[in-house]
Amino acid sequence: MSSSDVELQENKRDKLRSAAMKGKWSEVIEMYKQERDIRTVAITATRDNVLHMAVSSGDAKVVADIVDFVCAERDVVLRAYNDRNNTPLHLAASMGNVEMCRKIGDADPSLVTRCNIAGETPLFLAALYGNKTAFLWLHYLYIESPEVSSTDFSHYMRNNGDTILHCAIAEGHFDVAIEIVHLYKNLVKEMMMRRNKVGLTPLHLLAATPSAFKSTCLHGRSILVCLIYGFFRVEEKKQATMKEEVEQCERKSRVKFYQEIGFYQIRKMKEKHTWCLQIMNELLQHASDEDMSKIISRIPSEHLSISLEKEEDNESESMATPVPGTIIIETPLMIAAKTGVKEMVEKILELFPTRIKDVNDEGKNIVLLAADYRQIEVFRILCKQKRLTESIFRQVDKEGNNALHLAAMLGVKLDSLYHGETLSMLREIKWFEFVKNSMPPGLSERYNRKMETPDDIFRHSHKELMRSEREWLNQTSQACSVVSTLVLSVAFAIRSNVPGGYDGSNNKGFAILRNNKVFKWFEVCSSGALFFSLISTICFLSIVASRSQSVNSCRYVPFIRLHFGMLFMFISIVYLWISFCAGDFFMLDDDTLHKALPSYVVVSSVTILLVVTQLPTFLGPTLASISPIQAPRRKTTHPIEYRRAKEKENNIDLNSQD
C-alpha cells in the first residue's frame, strides 16, 4: 500500500471517528455503505470499531441498523474485538442493554461464550455488573445453542478463578446470585467449593458482607424504617425466572408509587436479606465438614501460591506461626464471627457442630473473635449454645488473653470518637460487664502473658478515654451551671414581683390579680421555672464538686445527672418565657398586645421546638442505662478486601475510549 493510500485510509478513519464521537450516526451509516474497508477498522486508542462505539452510546436503534446492514460481513464485524478482547456483545452485556444483546446475540449466538483478556464472557459480565435481565436472556440464548454441555464450567469462570457466583455476591447483586443458584443447580456444589486464586469461596464472600443480612443491616436503623421493613412481605425464590417471564419484564416498565417516597429502597433491602439467607442455606447444604475447616495461607507474589492447611486436634499444630508476609484467609465461620453475621454462625454450628473448636493463626476460636470484634449478637448465640463446653469459653489466644481480656480492650482509637461523645464510656463499661457476667467464674482474675488481668487492661486502656470524658463533663457542667444560675436568678426575681402587686389591705399579702386566669399561668410557670432551674443548678454543681478519677466514678450517674440537668435547664427556660409572656398580658393594652402576639408565637415555637429536638440527647444516657447492652463503637475492616484486589488484578475498563 502506497503512502497516499495510507494517508487516505487515515483520513477516512479520522472522519469516521469524529462522526461517531459526535453522535452523527446517519453519517457513520452512510460511510459504512460507501466504504467497505472501514467497517472493521479500529478507530480509537483502545482499538474499538464503530460497532463498539455504537453499543457504548446506548442507542439500540443505531446498533440494530449497523448489524442489519453488515449481514454479509456479520462474522467479521460482530466478532471484532478491542485491545481488551471485548466484542460489542461484551459491552452490551456490561451495560445491561437487553435490546442490543438480543440483536447481536441472535445474529451470532457463539459470541455468548467468547472470552475477553480476563477470561470473561458476555454472560459473565452481565452477572458481574448486576444486569439481571441481560444475564437471564444470555443464559437462555446459550443453553438453547447446539452442542452445549451441562457440565461445562469454563464459561462461568474467569482467569483468576472467580465464578459468576463469586462476582454476584461480592458486588452485592443478590437478585442475580439467587438466579445463578437456581439456574445451575448441578453446578452449585462445584461453585461453592471453587476457590479463586486468592483462596476465596462464595461462602467466604458472603460471610464478609454483613450488610446483606438482616441482623447487621437493621442495627442502628430508625424505628420508622424497621416498621416499614416489617410491613413488606418477601417470599423466598423457589425457581429461576423463566424465559417467558424475562420477555414479559422486557416489554413492560412499571414504576410503583412507593419508589418515589423511599419505600422501594426498603423493599429492595428486604429482598436482598431474604435472598442472601436463601443463598447461604443452599451453599451450606452442599458444603462438607472438610470444606468448612480449611484455612488458606498464601504468600503474596506475582503468581499466588496457595497451600491448604486442615486444622488438627493438636493445638500446637493449629496454632503454628505462619511465615512472615503470609496472608491468612480464615474459615467462613471465623469471618462470620468477626463481621457479626449471626445467621451464618447459627447455621454452620447447626450443620457442622465440630467446627466450634476451630482456631485461627492467632489461637482464637469464635468466642474470642466475637469478644475481640465486639459482636454482641454472635456472643449471645454462643452463650446460648448448650453444646458448648466451659473449655471453649476458657480458651486463650497466643498472648494468653481470654474473652474477658479482649473485651476489656478499648478497641477503637480516641481520635475516631466524636468529641464529647458521652455514651462511649458508658457503653464500654456495660460491654465489659456483659461479657464478665456471661463467662465462667474466675476468668476476671486470670493473667495473660503480660501478667495483666482483665480489670488491669480495662483500667489501662480506658484511662485516657475516662480522663477525656471527665474533663469534657466538668467543662460542660461548669458552663451549664452558669446559665442555670442566671435562669434561677431571673425566675426568683419574677416569682417575687408578681404583676399588679400585692393586696396589703388585709395584711395577708395576696396577689391582687390572683383570680385572673392568665395570672394562674404566670403563677404555675414562674414556679416551674424556679423549681427546674434550682434542680438543674444542683445537678451541675454536684458534677463539678465530684473530682474522682476512678473507673467506678464513670460507672453510674455522672452523665445521667448532666443530661437531666440540661433537660431541666431547658424546661425552666420554656417556663420562664411563658411566665414572661403572661406578665406582659397585664402590662400591654389590647392594641399593643395584638401587634406583639406574632412575635411571642414565633419565639415560643422556636424555644419549644429546640427543647423537643434535643430530647434524644438529654434522655439518651438514661435510656442507654436501662436498655439492652449495645456494643461500643469499634473501627473494623472487612476480613476480605475483595473488590479492590479484583480491580487491581483485572484492570479492566470496558467503557474506556479515546
List the predicted regions and their residue ranges.
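Inner-leaflet juxtamembrane helices
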Residues: 526-529, 533, 537-547
